């Protein structure tokens, strides 16, 4: 069993390694979530026999921790970097959601030669945390003509999201430290995250956003990230919010396939 420190990295790890491939993927989950949030995408990766690793960050899922030193964004970055180096991984493609997207960008800043490409899903950035309470409540509870079909079809998912929110609230003492650290990192002028986004440069990067995201503002994020690199490919999925990989897994995967096909043609 792996633990969350510099010697043995994670308390929980899930790996799919069918055979040696040129690329290896690492999934990085978001704040208050866990790697199971990618489960619908895992099944599509398995069908392609693409190798991947994923794990729960300290304080998330079954990786319990109340150590405030471990509940910091930079600690998560160190853990991922150490994991990649210790496993001697190359041609790594990081797939990071929300907070995990920020971790991915920061990892690329530290060990850029190990990272082949970035797939950022509603990534935390300097436009994040402009959350409107009314929009959150409307997303969960308000039904109207424009969203009726989506509301009915995703009733179980809505309940699941509420469950996650309730569980996060129950663990608010644990997440208080991490949340404060995230907000600090996402502030305009935070040199570390700002430089990390600027260092994307020519690195092949796909950004997938939900049109109805209440956490990572879609248009503001596109404007912000496009200013950091003109090589970023943006895909916006209509009718979904902060977790497009879970709400629209097939379309999400199609975008990933298209991105990887282009990557192959460009011989990165």
Swiss-Prot record:
Active site: 29, 98
One Pfam family named in its UniProt record: Hydrolase_4
Keyword Hydrolase: yes
Organism domain of life: Bacteria
SUPFAM superfamilies: alpha/beta-Hydrolases
EC number from the UniProt entry: 3.1.-.-
Single GO MF annotation: carboxylic ester hydrolase activity
UniProt keyword annotations, A-Z: Hydrolase, Serine esterase
Family classification: Belongs to the lipase/esterase LIP3/BchO family.
Protein name: Putative esterase/lipase 2
């Amino acid at each position: 069993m792996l633990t969350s420190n510099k010697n043995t990295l994670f308390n929980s790890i899930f790996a799919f390694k069918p055979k040696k491939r040129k690329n290896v993927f690492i999934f990085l989950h978001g704040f208050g979530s866990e790697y199971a949030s990618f489960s619908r995408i895992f099944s599509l990766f398995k069908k392609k026999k693409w190798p991947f690793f994923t794990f729960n960050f300290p304080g998330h899922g079954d990786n319990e921790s109340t150590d405030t030193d471990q509940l910091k964004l930079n600690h998560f970055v160190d853990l991922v970097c150490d994991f990649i180096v210790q496993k001697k991984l190359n041609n790594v493609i990081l797939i990071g959601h929300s907070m995990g997207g920020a971790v991915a960008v920061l990892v690329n800043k530290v060990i850029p030669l190990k990272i082949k490409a970035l797939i950022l899903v509603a990534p935390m950035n300097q436009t994040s945390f402009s959350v409107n309470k009314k929009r959150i409540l409307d997303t969960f509870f308000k039904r109207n003509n424009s969203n009726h079909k989506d509301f009915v079809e995703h009733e179980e998912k809505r309940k699941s999201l509420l469950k996650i929110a309730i569980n996060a609230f129950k663990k608010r003492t644990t997440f208080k430290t991490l949340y404060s650290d995230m907000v600090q990192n996402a502030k305009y002028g935070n040199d570390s995250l700002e430089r990390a986004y600027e260092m994307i440069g020519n690195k092949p990067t796909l950004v997938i956003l939900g049109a109805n995201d209440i956490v990572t503002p879609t248009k503001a994020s596109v404007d912000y990230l496009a200013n950091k690199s003109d090589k970023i490919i943006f895909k916006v999925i209509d009718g979904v919010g902060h977790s497009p990989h879970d709400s629209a897994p097939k379309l999400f995967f199609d975008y990933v396939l298209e991105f990887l096909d282009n990557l192959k043609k460009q011989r990165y």
